[in-house]
From Swiss-Prot:
Keywords: DNA damage, DNA repair, Hydrolase. PANTHER family: DNA-3-METHYLADENINE GLYCOSYLASE. Belongs to the DNA glycosylase MPG family. GO terms for biological process: base-excision repair. This is Putative 3-methyladenine DNA glycosylase. InterPro entries: Formyl_transferase-like_C_sf, MPG, MPG_sf. HAMAP family: 3MGH. One of its GO terms (molecular function) is alkylbase DNA N-glycosylase activity. Its EC number is 3.2.2.-. It comes from the Bacteria. SUPFAM superfamilies: FMT C-terminal domain-like (SSF50486). It is an enzyme of class 3 (hydrolase). The keyword Hydrolase applies.
Length: 193
């Protein structure tokens, strides 16, 4: 078991904190695009804001896969959101990746987003999926497999617990008071402070 696999087997809230600082990698157009995870939100099976709360559907079926599987969904008729499945198979929990700090492949990210401002490339769930060219083709990918087109990469430079801000989730209408959003303090690439 690698370190990322161990993180994703933690309780989802703990995993959402521990994923901060690690890398999301996209292999696109013969380029490697890398972003450091700087903001996450946890979604639990008993959480009214979680897609698996009511029941299993075709759309949310990947939430029930093994930890480390990608769960990508289309929202508002125009955006994709990228999640990392956590917990045991059949539970239905995931972590929404809300923001990344661009690390490598920045020129391609700028082309993908039609934006040049670095701070605006990946500072939100829809922005980062556009920058890394993540869409429904990436739903159900094993993010722990080094040969996957989208994967998680471990960062040995771990984030200290005192540098993690915990707050309410944003951009949702149900259970928005739950303190399940986490971000790296003072990081300029976070979507909202």
């Amino acid at each position: 078991m690698n370190n990322l696999e161990a993180i994703l087997r933690l309780k989802t809230i703990d995993a959402a904190k521990k994923l901060l600082g690690h890398f999301l990698v996209s292999k696109y157009n013969n380029k490697i695009l890398i972003g450091k995870i700087v903001e996450t939100e946890a979604y639990l099976y008993n959480d009214p804001a979680c897609h698996s709360y009511s029941n299993r559907t075709k759309r949310n079926s990947m939430m029930y896969a093994q930890a480390g599987t990608s769960y990508v969904y289309f929202t508002y008729g125009m955006h994709y959101c990228f999640n990392v499945v956590t917990a045991d198979v059949g539970i239905g929990e995931a972590i929404l990746i809300r923001a990344l700090e661009p690390i490598a492949g920045i020129e391609q990210m700028q082309l993908n987003r039609s934006k040049t401002k670095l701070m605006d490339l990946c500072s939100g769930p829809a922005k980062l999926t556009q920058a890394l060219n993540i869409n429904l083709k990436d739903n159900g990918i094993n993010l722990l497999d080094k040969d996957s087109s989208i994967l998680l990469r471990y960062n040995n430079d771990l984030i200290n617990e005192i540098d993690i801000v915990q707050t309410q989730r944003i951009g949702i209408s149900k259970a928005k008071d739950m303190p399940y959003r986490f971000y790296i303090k003072d990081n300029i690439f976070v979507s909202k402070k």
